[in-house]
Amino acid sequence: MENAHTKTVEEVLAYFGVNESTGLSLEQVKKLKEKWGSNELPAEEGKTLLELVIEQFEDLLVRILLLAACISFVLAWFEEGEETITAFVEPFVILLILVANAIVGVWQERNAENAIEALKEYEPEMGKVYRQDRKSVQRIKARDIVPGDIVEVAVGDKVPADIRITSIKSTTLRVDQSILTGESVSVIKHTDPVPDPRAVNQDKKNMLFSGTNIAAGKAMGVVIATGVNTEIGKIRDEMVATEQERTPLQQKLDEFGEQLSKVISLICIAVWIINIGHFNDPVHGGSWIRGAIYYFKIAVALAVAAIPEGLPAVITTCLALGTRRMAKKNAIVRSLPSVETLGCTSVICSDKTGTLTTNQMSVCRMFILDKVEGDSCSLNEFTVTGSTYAPMGEVHKDDKLIKCSQYDGLVELATICALCNDSSLDYNEAKGVYEKVGEATETALTCLVEKMNVFDTDLKGLSRIERANACNSVIKQLMKKEFTLEFSRDRKSMSVYCTPNKPSRTSMSKMFVKGAPEGVIDRCTHVRVGNAKIPLSSGIKQKIMSVIREWGTGRDTLRCLALATHDNPPRKEEMNLEDSSNFINYETNLTFVGCVGMLDPPRIEVASSIKLCKQAGIRVIMITGDNKGTAVAICRRIGIFVEDEDVSTKAFTGREFDELSLAAQRDACHHARCFARVEPSHKSKIVEFLQSFDEITAMTGDGVNDAPALKKAEIGIAMGSGTAVAKTASEMVLADDNFSTIVAAVEEGRAIYNNMKQFIRYLISSNVGEVVCIFLTAALGFPEALIPVQLLWVNLVTDGLPATALGFNPPDLDIMNKPPRNPKEPLISGWLFFRYLAIGCYVGAATVGAAAWWFIAADGGPRVTFYQLSHFLQCKEDNPDFSGVDCVVFESPYPMTMALSVLVTIEMCNALNSLSENQSLMRMPPWENIWLVGAICLSMSLHFLILYVEPLPIIFQITPLNVTQWLMVLKISLPVILLDETLKYVARNYLEPGKDSVQPATKPCSLSACTEGVSWPFVFITLPLVIWLYSTDTNFSDMFW
């Protein structure tokens, strides 16, 4: 039924053709069941495990690797001789990598799907209905309830469907609907129509929503929606419709993968075509097909070389390390890729209650009457310190500390606060904090009594548990609470009837009243001044109301409560407590005692965090279900708005936002910094508009209602105290519910991205080198310098360790002084691409050169000519060009070992180059990142392991090297540092002359300026070693003449 909240009870009952006392007939139930189906949320049809697994292989690079593995497997099957076993190692290793990557991917996807399932925990098992087949109420399964059913709910019940209340069977009906609307206090319901068809859920006071809890009272109502048509069902539909966006990094890697796969395909085809002329060479037994297969194997090796297999593992490790660092700062990251997305967050949409504020109501101001002269009066105003539920704080008057026991008015005010109250404080030993038991407003009054300590109770030596309610206990010992007149909407107040514990002629029964100031003061006839009772004149009333109005608006927007007493109420026997409409008659002739002003105070550290966000170019938007006045006041307090800023185009209520045209809504989202009185659908809309401006949005939320927006935003942030649905729909959970934690996480995200850029570039330059190596050997006609199983070892293990260590590079000091990076900026710019191409070409040439050195110039080598080496496939005993050459030498493991050792050593040097994008190694020595030094040592140790420990050399087709050969490896490898230092110098001084450059690039640099910041220990250690290395004899020059 649409807009049931606007209709009268009679209209709703007539619509369903049902009688409130008898309920639906079985015939009606059957028809309605057929029309509307079961009252349950359908189980989410998630992807099957097989679908999820197949999805992981949709990536182009993964497909190329899979193809390479299949081809390698087929070729290994037909391999003959000794190599049969080693031939199977390569496809097996590739498949192992792919399986590991797929497992990680499937696990992450599965996590994302749990959010929709978690909604089911809010479905009640049973419901109580009236139907015509039975005279009394009957319990049935909640899933069998249909629209039109008459349902009964009582305290503790979970509401089984969306219900229009028809009658309330208790004084009041309070409902905790925080999971749906985010309201922190329970809501009082009624049966009157709410005439506004566009009312938000918070304002539908005559409705009960499925999944919410009855906090107090008992009621009956008619079901108006079941299953997916309920408010919680609509949230489920919205979540199902929300597709997870890929993170900026995932998009970058997808683009990179596509480009790389095109390049790989081209290079593989090129290598194959270049060598068509060699297909018939004698070494292939003159068989064209064998020759084609041989070069096909080389093309497969190329594909394996070009793909950075280690990249997914290194990225996952780096992000996992990042999540551990974030967890220490109370940010628990649920989805690894979102760690990096945090780094480019440009807008943070934050909830007010509990995130920007403490969600711990506290009294900060109060007043009593000081003097009354005729029609005018003066007030004693006090301020109270302390912004949490901890019972510690001070009371000040005119900025001076005072003792509350010296003011009779304050003693009476504290008495009313303690007795007209059903809440208390509790010390949670596990968390080490004081918590509320009961309503937030009443707990604030309990806490105020503790801070006032009006009877000067000795609090020293009390344990924290005893301290929680010590002062309240003293007051409660003086008087006994007989009964409570519950709060009702018509009088907007509640009261307690108390009798003295020690009866005497002077002490008598009293009624203590608290409530909304305008309602209570209208029923007051006197005011309390000290111990005296003075008639309330219109002048005094005006003065009191003007102060209350002032407190309720402006910067503070305090929630004010008036406190009053009835000095001689009727005897309890004379009072009719059955009918709550009589209560107002007993709360008349009151004496006004004082007023307290309370608020949910901002967290102390939030203002500095918002300042940091402004420096970092991040816009903070407050989104709250609270009213606009309070929201704007808090915004001014914490720095989202400056003190006297005009907010007419920067703060909107949900209603105001809906009334704007689409273009105006879009414009509002571009400038607004505060949205008040919003519903969940508004949050999703705001996220959509922000995404249309290419903003990367972080959205906080804690209720079920926030789940769709959390899922839609790039970074959904749930509160640690929030619902399971919100947590499972989010990417990150704030363990301490604190806004400042988000800012710390953004800073960490930025640092992680910078480090990630470094190691992605490092790994890619390594792959470029491998591709160049294989391309050169094929183009020059040399024997294979590297085989796929060696390439996999380098890509995964020896490169993987330093790449992971680069994730520990220290963050830049000015990381939060820069605007958020553009998520569309390329991972590798044009200049950087040239740099890595240059480095890669050197790596490839050096690797091939090392293999050629063994053939042409090494002492223990065959010392063949360049021609013989480049035409080795024509080597036969009867070929005059190869007289005196044993053709078996071309299958020796030495050249491969030289090539692999040079590749590994160059990569270690390259890791040192990656310590900083543009900073010289002489200024940023290796020990700046001690993890990197350790990783390089470990990688070299693993390389020695495969060289010198049996049977590993057989698997990798390599052999141990002697000292001369190792010296040659170092000679060929070290120049890569010089090459990158030159490229860094060009970048620093000519392409990106920024803060680092001491002198303008045009002027020659003076010696003192050039050597400033140089790490002399590094220079003194490395220079003699380099000079010694290049002075040793390794027949290097014999290669060239």
UniProtKB/Swiss-Prot annotation:
What highest taxon heads this organism's lineage? Eukaryota
Q: Where is this region: Interaction with PLN?
A: 787-807, 931-942
The record ties this protein, via Gene3D superfamilies, to: Calcium-transporting ATPase, cytoplasmic domain N (3.40.1110.10), Calcium-transporting ATPase, cytoplasmic transduction domain A (2.70.150.10), Calcium-transporting ATPase, transmembrane domain (1.20.1110.10), HAD superfamily/HAD-like (3.40.50.1000)
Q: Which InterPro entries match?
A: ATPase_P-typ_cation-transptr_C, ATPase_P-typ_cation-transptr_N, ATPase_P-typ_cyto_dom_N, ATPase_P-typ_P_site, ATPase_P-typ_TM_dom_sf, ATPase_P-typ_transduc_dom_A_sf, HAD-like_sf, HAD_sf
Q: Where is it located?
A: Endoplasmic reticulum membrane; Sarcoplasmic reticulum membrane
Task: Please give the residue ranges for the topological domain Cytoplasmic.
Answer: 1-48, 111-253, 314-756, 808-827, 917-929, 985-1041
Q: What is its EC number?
A: 7.2.2.10
Q: Which reaction does it catalyse?
A: Ca(2+)(in) + ATP + H2O = Ca(2+)(out) + ADP + phosphate + H(+)
Annotated protein name in UniProt = Sarcoplasmic/endoplasmic reticulum calcium ATPase 2
Organism equals Gallus gallus (Chicken)
